[in-house]
Protein backbone atom coordinates (compact mmCIF):
# COMPACT_ATOMS: atom_id res chain seq x y z
CA UNK A 1 0.00 0.00 0.00
CA UNK A 2 2.80 2.41 0.82
CA UNK A 3 4.40 1.90 -2.60
CA UNK A 4 1.11 2.59 -4.39
CA UNK A 5 0.48 5.72 -2.35
CA UNK A 6 4.03 6.91 -2.99
CA UNK A 7 3.66 6.31 -6.74
CA UNK A 8 0.37 8.22 -6.75
CA UNK A 9 1.87 11.12 -4.79
CA UNK A 10 4.88 11.34 -7.08
CA UNK A 11 2.63 11.27 -10.16
CA UNK A 12 0.59 14.07 -8.58
CA UNK A 13 3.82 16.07 -8.18
CA UNK A 14 4.50 15.70 -11.91
CA UNK A 15 0.95 16.79 -12.70
CA UNK A 16 1.42 19.82 -10.43
CA UNK A 17 4.72 20.62 -12.19
CA UNK A 18 2.93 20.28 -15.50
CA UNK A 19 0.12 22.65 -14.48
CA UNK A 20 2.54 25.20 -13.04
CA UNK A 21 4.83 24.90 -16.04
CA UNK A 22 2.02 25.32 -18.55
CA UNK A 23 0.63 28.33 -16.71
CA UNK A 24 4.06 29.97 -16.32
CA UNK A 25 5.22 29.30 -19.88
CA UNK A 26 1.94 30.08 -21.68
CA UNK A 27 2.99 33.61 -22.58
CA UNK A 28 6.22 32.31 -24.16
CA UNK A 29 4.43 30.47 -26.94
CA UNK A 30 4.15 26.93 -28.18
CA UNK A 31 7.86 26.25 -28.64
CA UNK A 32 8.69 26.93 -24.97
CA UNK A 33 5.47 25.56 -23.46
CA UNK A 34 5.42 22.44 -25.64
CA UNK A 35 9.09 21.70 -24.99
CA UNK A 36 8.54 22.05 -21.24
CA UNK A 37 5.49 19.78 -21.33
CA UNK A 38 7.37 17.11 -23.31
CA UNK A 39 10.29 17.36 -20.89
CA UNK A 40 7.95 16.77 -17.93
CA UNK A 41 6.28 13.84 -19.71
CA UNK A 42 9.64 12.19 -20.37
CA UNK A 43 11.00 12.80 -16.87
CA UNK A 44 7.81 11.35 -15.36
CA UNK A 45 8.02 8.15 -17.42
CA UNK A 46 11.75 7.77 -16.80
CA UNK A 47 11.62 8.32 -13.05
CA UNK A 48 8.22 6.88 -12.12
CA UNK A 49 7.42 4.44 -14.95
CA UNK A 50 4.89 4.01 -17.72
CA UNK A 51 1.75 4.39 -15.59
CA UNK A 52 2.89 7.74 -14.24
CA UNK A 53 3.94 8.95 -17.68
CA UNK A 54 0.60 7.93 -19.19
CA UNK A 55 -1.35 9.67 -16.43
CA UNK A 56 0.58 12.91 -16.91
CA UNK A 57 0.29 12.55 -20.71
CA UNK A 58 -3.50 12.29 -20.54
CA UNK A 59 -3.94 15.14 -18.06
CA UNK A 60 -1.70 17.54 -20.00
CA UNK A 61 -4.01 18.48 -22.91
CA UNK A 62 -7.03 18.87 -20.63
CA UNK A 63 -5.11 21.19 -18.31
CA UNK A 64 -3.83 23.17 -21.30
CA UNK A 65 -7.39 23.64 -22.54
CA UNK A 66 -8.64 24.67 -19.09
CA UNK A 67 -5.81 27.20 -18.86
CA UNK A 68 -6.88 28.63 -22.20
CA UNK A 69 -3.70 27.62 -24.03
CA UNK A 70 -4.94 24.36 -25.48
CA UNK A 71 -6.81 23.79 -28.72
CA UNK A 72 -10.41 22.84 -29.38
CA UNK A 73 -11.94 20.13 -27.18
CA UNK A 74 -12.33 17.90 -30.25
CA UNK A 75 -8.54 17.75 -30.57
CA UNK A 76 -7.90 16.64 -26.96
CA UNK A 77 -8.15 12.86 -27.61
CA UNK A 78 -5.64 13.18 -30.44
CA UNK A 79 -3.29 15.19 -28.23
CA UNK A 80 -3.60 12.49 -25.57
CA UNK A 81 -2.73 9.90 -28.23
CA UNK A 82 0.32 11.93 -29.29
CA UNK A 83 1.49 12.26 -25.69
CA UNK A 84 0.84 8.55 -25.15
CA UNK A 85 2.99 7.73 -28.19
CA UNK A 86 5.80 9.92 -26.85
CA UNK A 87 5.70 8.38 -23.38
CA UNK A 88 5.35 4.75 -24.47
CA UNK A 89 8.00 4.91 -27.19
CA UNK A 90 10.41 6.54 -24.74
CA UNK A 91 9.58 3.87 -22.15
CA UNK A 92 9.94 0.94 -24.57
CA UNK A 93 13.12 2.12 -26.27
CA UNK A 94 14.88 2.82 -22.97
CA UNK A 95 14.20 -0.78 -21.93
CA UNK A 96 16.72 -1.90 -24.58
CA UNK A 97 19.81 -3.28 -22.89
CA UNK A 98 22.98 -1.54 -24.02
CA UNK A 99 26.39 -0.75 -22.65
CA UNK A 100 25.85 2.89 -23.61
CA UNK A 101 22.75 4.34 -21.95
CA UNK A 102 23.26 7.65 -23.78
CA UNK A 103 22.86 5.99 -27.19
CA UNK A 104 19.65 4.34 -25.99
CA UNK A 105 18.30 7.66 -24.70
CA UNK A 106 19.12 9.38 -27.99
CA UNK A 107 17.34 6.56 -29.84
CA UNK A 108 14.39 7.06 -27.48
CA UNK A 109 14.43 10.80 -28.18
CA UNK A 110 14.37 10.28 -31.95
CA UNK A 111 11.72 7.56 -31.98
CA UNK A 112 9.46 9.21 -29.39
CA UNK A 113 9.59 12.62 -31.08
CA UNK A 114 8.86 11.04 -34.46
CA UNK A 115 6.07 8.92 -32.97
CA UNK A 116 4.37 11.92 -31.40
CA UNK A 117 4.73 13.95 -34.60
CA UNK A 118 3.30 11.15 -36.78
CA UNK A 119 0.41 10.51 -34.37
CA UNK A 120 -0.56 14.19 -34.20
CA UNK A 121 -0.03 14.87 -37.89
CA UNK A 122 -2.19 12.01 -39.11
CA UNK A 123 -4.68 12.21 -36.24
CA UNK A 124 -5.29 15.95 -36.30
CA UNK A 125 -4.05 17.38 -39.60
CA UNK A 126 -5.15 14.52 -41.87
CA UNK A 127 -8.17 13.12 -39.98
CA UNK A 128 -9.77 15.37 -37.37
CA UNK A 129 -9.55 18.76 -39.08
CA UNK A 130 -10.73 17.73 -42.57
CA UNK A 131 -13.24 15.04 -41.51
CA UNK A 132 -14.68 16.04 -38.12
CA UNK A 133 -14.25 19.79 -37.88
CA UNK A 134 -15.91 22.33 -40.10
CA UNK A 135 -13.30 25.08 -39.80
CA UNK A 136 -12.74 28.03 -42.09
CA UNK A 137 -9.71 27.47 -44.31
CA UNK A 138 -7.55 29.98 -42.42
CA UNK A 139 -8.31 28.37 -39.05
CA UNK A 140 -7.74 24.87 -40.47
CA UNK A 141 -4.36 26.02 -41.78
CA UNK A 142 -3.46 27.47 -38.37
CA UNK A 143 -4.36 24.20 -36.62
CA UNK A 144 -2.36 22.25 -39.21
CA UNK A 145 0.64 24.48 -38.54
CA UNK A 146 0.44 23.91 -34.80
CA UNK A 147 0.21 20.12 -35.13
CA UNK A 148 2.80 19.42 -37.77
CA UNK A 149 6.56 20.01 -37.70
CA UNK A 150 6.34 22.22 -34.61
CA UNK A 151 5.39 19.13 -32.60
CA UNK A 152 8.50 17.36 -33.83
CA UNK A 153 10.60 20.31 -32.65
CA UNK A 154 8.98 20.59 -29.20
CA UNK A 155 9.20 16.83 -28.60
CA UNK A 156 12.86 16.86 -29.68
CA UNK A 157 13.72 19.83 -27.47
CA UNK A 158 11.93 18.30 -24.47
CA UNK A 159 13.70 15.00 -25.14
CA UNK A 160 17.10 16.65 -25.48
CA UNK A 161 16.59 18.44 -22.15
CA UNK A 162 15.65 15.12 -20.57
CA UNK A 163 18.75 13.41 -22.00
CA UNK A 164 20.91 16.05 -20.29
CA UNK A 165 18.95 16.28 -17.03
CA UNK A 166 18.32 12.57 -16.35
CA UNK A 167 21.96 11.71 -15.50
CA UNK A 168 22.05 14.59 -13.02
CA UNK A 169 18.77 13.47 -11.46
CA UNK A 170 20.04 9.89 -11.21
CA UNK A 171 23.26 11.02 -9.54
CA UNK A 172 21.42 13.24 -7.07
CA UNK A 173 18.91 10.48 -6.36
CA UNK A 174 21.64 7.91 -5.64
CA UNK A 175 23.51 10.35 -3.40
CA UNK A 176 20.41 11.45 -1.52
CA UNK A 177 19.07 7.98 -0.83
CA UNK A 178 22.31 6.17 0.00
CA UNK A 179 23.22 8.37 2.97
Task: Give the positions of each predicted feature.
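Loop-helix junctions at membrane interfaces
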Residues: 1-179
Amino acid sequence: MKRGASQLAQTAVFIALLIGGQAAAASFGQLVTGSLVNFILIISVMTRGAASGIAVACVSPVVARLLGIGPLWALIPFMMAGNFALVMLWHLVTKIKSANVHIVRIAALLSAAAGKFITLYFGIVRLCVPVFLNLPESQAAAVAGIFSVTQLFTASIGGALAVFVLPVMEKVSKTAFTK
